[in-house]
Amino acid sequence: MSLDFNTLAQNFTQFYYNQFDTDRSQLGNLYRNESMLTFETSQLQGAKDIVEKLVSLPFQKVQHRITTLDAQPASPNGDVLVMITGDLLIDEEQNPQRFSQVFHLIPDGNSYYVFNDIFRLNYSA
């Protein structure tokens, strides 16, 4: 893989959130049967169940605004960990919700897939 892990993380994140914000039903090719999503308190495994969960979320319009993006190599095999924080604008809400998301990306030929995906809304105390 010719991309360094920071460039990979930036490219992946831009693609993922652009796809999520325009048509999240098309995210299935980023996951595999062994992939796992933890979305708040729900845990799902497999691309089909993950996409069904994402499509069922109760909003029509969404926009992710990334505040921070950190990446690290996760193994000698080329795995990459990506942590994102940002703001989530849902439907016509004026006040964004804060979120955090972590991706564990695994090399697959000339590309990567999401092995683990952890999403959490961050509420102020």
Curated annotation (Swiss-Prot):
Tell me where in or outside the cell this protein is found. Cytoplasm
At the top level, the lineage of the source is Eukaryota
Outline the extent of the NTF2 domain: 8-121
Tell me where in this chain the PTM N-acetylserine is found.
2
What InterPro entries does the record point to?
NTF2 (IPR045875), NTF2-like_dom_sf (IPR032710), NTF2_dom (IPR002075), Nuclear_transport_factor_2_euk (IPR018222)
Disulfide bonding pattern of the chain: none
Q: Name one GO cellular component term.
A: cytoplasm
GO terms, biological process = nucleocytoplasmic transport; protein import into nucleus
The record, for Pfam families, names:
NTF2
The UniProt keyword set, sorted, is: Acetylation, Cytoplasm, Isopeptide bond, Protein transport, Transport, Ubl conjugation
Q: What role does this protein play?
A: Facilitates protein transport into the nucleus. Interacts with various nucleoporins and with Ran-GDP. Could be part of a multicomponent system of cytosolic factors that assemble at the pore complex during nuclear import. In vitro, the NTF2-Ran-GDP association, in the presence of GTP, triggers dissociation of the karyopherin alpha-beta complex, allowing nuclear translocation of karyopherin alpha and the NLS substrate.
What is this protein identified as? Answer: Nuclear transport factor 2
The organism of origin for this protein: Saccharomyces cerevisiae (strain ATCC 204508 / S288c) (Baker's yeast)
